[in-house]
Amino acid sequence: MNNRITRRDFLKLAGLLPISVAAPRFLGSLDALGRVQVNTQNVIVIVFDAWSAYHISLYGYQRETTPNIAKLADQAVIYHNHYASGNFTTPGTASILTGALPWSHRAFQPGGKVDEAFVEKNFFSAFKNHYRITYSHNLWANILLRQFRDDLETYIPKGKYFLTEEDADSNRGFFLSSNNIIQDLFGNDEDIALVSWIRAMENEQEGYAYSLFLSPLYEEYKKRYNETRFAEQKALFPRGIPRDDYDNFLLEQAIDGIGGLLVTTPQPFMGYFHFWPPHAPYSTHRDFYRRFYEDGYNPPVKPIDLFGDEGPKTKNRTEYDEYILYVDREFGRFYDHLDENGLLENTWIVLTSDHGELFERGIEGHRTPVLYEPVVRVPLMIFDPGRESRTDVYANTSAVDLLPTLLHVTGQKQIEWAEGVILPPFASDETVQDRSVFVVQAEKNEQIGPLTIATLAIRNGDYKLMYFFGYEELGTGGERIELYNIKDDPEELNNLYDTEKEIGQELLNALKAKLKEMNAPYLSTS
């Protein structure tokens, strides 16, 4: 039996896809489709941005933030000590997509790109026998995805699932989102153009607009526009319609759109889908509004950190938890849609995040030098075809493990550049025993050069060590070292570095040795 898709088959399938999504790439996809084998399993990777495992009830959080996912967990492998490779989108996403750590792929600056050596070393090139499709709400994730576009059959533009005039109430004026202006005018340079637009016109949390006159006018106009033009949607979201830093969206619109698209996508496919929630601003659906207000939950009180500036962030923490409820519901709907359309029978689903979120020690968010658990420990759940029971894995795992694991379980050829391992239960537990897992925060460094200002974390067994160096807050030549037993002290309140010197020194030496190895190519030999 010939299992290869012919040109005739491909054209039939192409006709089923929405032309706005498929047309730009179809003619260049014939060679790739010729490689597709119909008896290979599909892969879907779902990333919800800034989603901390610390805030997930499935992992023991006191607030019930994930009731739907908890039910689905009976059909999944649940990883309890899974770590992002960085603490914001660029390094965290790049490690998922390349299977390498930030000090290797070098995408550790805000909005940065992977080093040229990794442009052809990515999830999509590794799954060359699959139809490859992707979408992201997140601009920085899209910058990376566009680097890998030559290895994609379908790249869905960022603006596809943001609100436009077609979603608005009738006859109330006209407005184009930043995404759609850029997509229409600068399709081939969308990422660069959108960053330029933002800097010129938008005054947001990541910086200041270049135009001090136009920016306030634009922001005020957009605010008033959204209050009237999207009145129907606004009624569903008491804290405002969900948005990234620049434009509005509905998560259910992206979930429904991608879910519908996958039903008609050529199989086997490999899809990477990166959604904005529960990243700030925390604009949950009215069904979950004030669900946790005055519920009596009081998080542990922790000291203000050297890099912190305020006290407890209880209000925003509560709103973040309520936003997770929205994520939980929408993933449940997405899973049910795949089930109803028969895709669960031959599809691996990975549910994870690029980094976490922090509401303690005077710090809110994730762009911070600290690497405490809430900002680096993220969910990982793998739903494999036909699974009917739950498996819990407590070994330390990393974002860089996803690529080799998914290649293994789908019978694809392994790649030489991946820095992760094949995860249990799909391989022997020996692959993760006694291994060290690393997290890298190095955004203040040049992409091509040694790391001289950074925070590095290493997790081995029950212990986690954080090593801070180069920050001006530490003084000239200063460094800061913290050691925690995560099993005994999950809140990281008791620094053991001065009392468990042997373990601390062993982990610090391992971390410094790895840093020396990764810095070596960038140090002058003269």
What is each PLM-predicted segment?
Residues 2-526:
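Catalytic domains that recognize anionic headgroups
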